[in-house]
């Protein structure tokens, strides 16, 4: 079966490698153009491009798939089916119509929950106990296509969005490798999503990780995991970002201390919040490397408020 693979970031590398290793014929890889990256704005290739080149798969990097010339190039690959894994552009109907079997998408959530660009972040913020990955057939409506395969697993209490997104995408690649042959043979009974049960996530912005100490400690602790690695969770300290990398919520703590006030208790570095206290475990002051909160506090005894 001739597969056209569309993906861009590091999390889309594992599914590509798994499909290749399982013997599927990948006729081409479509990925975003090389972009400037880092402080020096060095032109950098997407991780999926580098992986495809290692595997000897032809690579196509259009600026946009809205361009008729790009659509013609996709047709020239003569794919029977397409696979999409974090490509970075919504596919229009003329692109969706190219492969006879359409496009399959790996989405790291238990659809119809958490449609959109940040499903694992959404699950962590909500305090969910379960997470999963779904294989769907793409339709014009975002993440709303019929489900061809789904895997559900417990979400660890210390789950961090970046790590778990990568893990779920890898497991999605394994699931996809199993689904594809059965799908091509017409042996899968697709499950239509119940739109009335759908929930949605939004694109994450840099300001989403800014802490409001009036929020409950449990909410802030979830933020430190949901916004890892980007944008991170931080406060402004002397007009500079002070990142809280790891923390623990003490929901049973109660006091009359103003939210945002630093205090110590039994060797723990704590911050009062709107409900409970947040124990700081690992922090990163501006311009410095990550460090244990206790080490930071020894050199910052004069700071009383975050």
From Swiss-Prot:
<feature type="binding site">
    <location>
        <begin position="109"/>
        <end position="112"/>
    </location>
    <ligand>
        <name>(6S)-5,6,7,8-tetrahydrofolate</name>
    </ligand>
</feature>
<comment type="function">
    <text>Attaches a formyl group to the free amino group of methionyl-tRNA(fMet). The formyl group appears to play a dual role in the initiator identity of N-formylmethionyl-tRNA by promoting its recognition by IF2 and preventing the misappropriation of this tRNA by the elongation apparatus.</text>
</comment>
<dbReference type="GO" id="GO:0004479">
    <property type="term" value="F:methionyl-tRNA formyltransferase activity"/>
</dbReference>
<dbReference type="Pfam" id="PF00551">
    <property type="entry name" value="Formyl_trans_N"/>
</dbReference>
<dbReference type="InterPro" id="IPR005794">
    <property type="entry name" value="Fmt"/>
</dbReference>
<comment type="similarity">
    <text>Belongs to the Fmt family.</text>
</comment>
<dbReference type="InterPro" id="IPR005793">
    <property type="entry name" value="Formyl_trans_C"/>
</dbReference>
<dbReference type="InterPro" id="IPR036477">
    <property type="entry name" value="Formyl_transf_N_sf"/>
</dbReference>
<dbReference type="InterPro" id="IPR044135">
    <property type="entry name" value="Met-tRNA-FMT_C"/>
</dbReference>
<dbReference type="InterPro" id="IPR002376">
    <property type="entry name" value="Formyl_transf_N"/>
</dbReference>
<dbReference type="GO" id="GO:0005829">
    <property type="term" value="C:cytosol"/>
</dbReference>
<dbReference type="InterPro" id="IPR037022">
    <property type="entry name" value="Formyl_trans_C_sf"/>
</dbReference>
<dbReference type="InterPro" id="IPR041711">
    <property type="entry name" value="Met-tRNA-FMT_N"/>
</dbReference>
<protein>
    <recommendedName>
        <fullName>Methionyl-tRNA formyltransferase</fullName>
        <ecNumber>2.1.2.9</ecNumber>
    </recommendedName>
</protein>
<keyword id="KW-0808">Transferase</keyword>
<keyword id="KW-0648">Protein biosynthesis</keyword>
<dbReference type="Pfam" id="PF02911">
    <property type="entry name" value="Formyl_trans_C"/>
</dbReference>
<dbReference type="InterPro" id="IPR011034">
    <property type="entry name" value="Formyl_transferase-like_C_sf"/>
</dbReference>
């Amino acid at each position: 079966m001739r597969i056209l693979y569309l993906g861009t970031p590091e999390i889309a590398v594992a599914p590509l490698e798994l499909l290749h290793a399982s013997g599927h014929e990948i006729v081409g890889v479509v990925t975003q153009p090389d972009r400037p990256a880092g402080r020096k704005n060095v032109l950098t290739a997407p991780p999926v491009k580098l992986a495809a080149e290692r595997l000897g798969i032809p690579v196509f990097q259009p600026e946009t798939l809205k361009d008729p010339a790009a659509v013609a190039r996709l047709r020239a690959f003569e794919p029977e089916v397409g696979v999409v894994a974090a490509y970075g552009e919504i596919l229009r109907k003329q692109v969706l119509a190219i492969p006879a079997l359409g496009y399959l998408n790996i989405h790291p959530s238990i659809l119809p929950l958490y449609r959109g660009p940040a499903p694992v972040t959404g699950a962590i913020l909500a305090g969910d106990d379960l997470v999963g990955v779904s294989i769907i057939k793409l339709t014009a409506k975002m993440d709303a296509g019929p489900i061809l395969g789904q895997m559900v697993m417990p979400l660890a209490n210390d789950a961090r969005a970046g790590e778990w997104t990568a893990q779920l995408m890898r497991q999605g690649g394994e699931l996809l490798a199993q689904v594809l042959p059965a799908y091509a043979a017409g042996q899968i009974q697709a499950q239509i999503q119940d739109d009335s049960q759908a929930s949605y996530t939004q694109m994450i912005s840099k300001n989403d990780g800014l802490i409001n100490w009036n929020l409950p400690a449990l909410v802030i602790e979830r933020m430190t995991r949901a916004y890892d690695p980007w944008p991170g969770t931080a406060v402004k300290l002397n007009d500079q970002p002070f990142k809280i990398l790891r923390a623990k919520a003490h929901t049973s703590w109660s006091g009359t201390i103003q939210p945002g006030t630093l205090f110590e208790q039994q060797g723990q570095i704590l911050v009062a919040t709107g409900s409970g206290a947040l124990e700081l475990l690992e922090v990163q002051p501006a311009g410095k490397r990550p460090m244990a909160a206790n080490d930071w506090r020894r050199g910052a005894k004069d700071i009383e408020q975050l």
